[in-house]
Design a protein with these regions (language model features):
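Phosphate-binding active sites in nucleotide-utilizing proteins
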Residues: 231-281
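Glycine- (often His-adjacent) and acidic-residue-rich active-site loop
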Residues: 1-26, 45, 75-77
């Protein structure tokens, strides 16, 4: 994926637009080459990494538990501006693409093949031979079904309206503008954020994006605290105390409990804690 540290340096509107333009133009050049190109995906391929893979003619996924693909930019309060909003709907259809982009979902290799994101899903032992065969075959990519083409073309408004309604149930635009920007840029500008500089400026330097990027780095720092200097292995947590029983806190508590940890949950009242316990059950 892209270097998230770079986002912290976007202190002017011009820098934000330059960052989007650089990736957009580069990946468009890759997508336009006449010779076959292939992305062999093994491990995490997220954000800018998947946008690079989408610019290739073929995408071959390695069937391992660690192979994950997604466009999770919305989790940082931003959008996939390097071609992901254009090419993902063309690959998998707009409904599936919106589901991935608006929720920041990641998928494994098998699901990537089923939904049409990956041309094939192969075990590690044959990945290099499979990549060679796919490139040399020069076969056309599997086309989108006719109805999906309509939804990605003349009927875009239908998908966009439905997506806005779903997003509105989870977040208000003034507090969380990124998913609304993704819908608008795809529906009105064919995924090209450069045509809507006011959206780029408003999203990239928004307080929401700054705070979510800060949260990301804090999470990464917390992960490092769980590492042990002991040569016997990493520190193994046994008990977790979660402060705040909102949607995120409640889901973290449930996730930890499902993995066998002893979990306690804290908030200002039982009325705030009860919904989290109900969801966990």
């Amino acid at each position: 994926g892209a270097d998230i540290q770079e986002f912290t340096q976007l202190d002017t509107a011009e820098k934000g637009r330059e960052l989007v333009e650089r990736g957009w133009n580069l990946f468009n050049r890759l997508a336009a080459v006449r010779y076959p190109t292939l992305a062999l995906v093994r491990g995490h391929c997220l954000g800018g990494g998947l946008e690079l893979a989408l610019a290739c003619r073929y995408l071959l996924a390695v069937d391992e538990s660690g192979t994950k693909m997604g466009l999770p930019e919305v989790m940082l309060g931003i959008f996939p501006g390097w071609g992901g909003m254009l090419r993902l709907p063309e690959r998998v259809g707009p409904a599936a693409a919106m589901d991935m982009m608006l929720a920041g979902k990641t998928i494994d290799a098998k699901r990537a093949k089923r939904m049409g994101l990956a041309d094939d899903c192969v075990p590690p032992r044959v990945m290099e031979n499979a990549a060679r065969m796919l490139v040399l075959s020069n076969q056309p990519r599997r086309p989108l079904p006719f109805m999906q083409k309509l939804l990605n073309g003349p009927l875009k408004r239908v998908v966009a309206n439905g997506a806005r309604k779903q997003v509105a149930k989870r977040a208000r635009q003034e507090h969380y503008p990124a998913p609304y920007a993704i819908i608008d840029i795809w529906a009105k500008h064919n995924g090209n954020a450069l045509v809507a500089p006011e959206l780029v400026d408003g999203i990239v330097r928004s307080p929401t994006a700054r705070n979510l990027v800060r949260v990301f780095f804090l999470q990464e720092r917390l992960k490092s605290f769980g590492k042990s200097d002991d040569k016997s292995g990493d520190f193994k947590a046994k008990r977790v105390h979660v402060v705040g029983a909102g949607v995120m806190g409640g889901d973290i508590a449930a996730w930890c409990a499902l993995r066998g940890l002893t979990v306690t949950l804290q908030d200002q009242s039982m009325e705030r804690i009860a919904p989290a316990i109900k969801r966990a059950r």
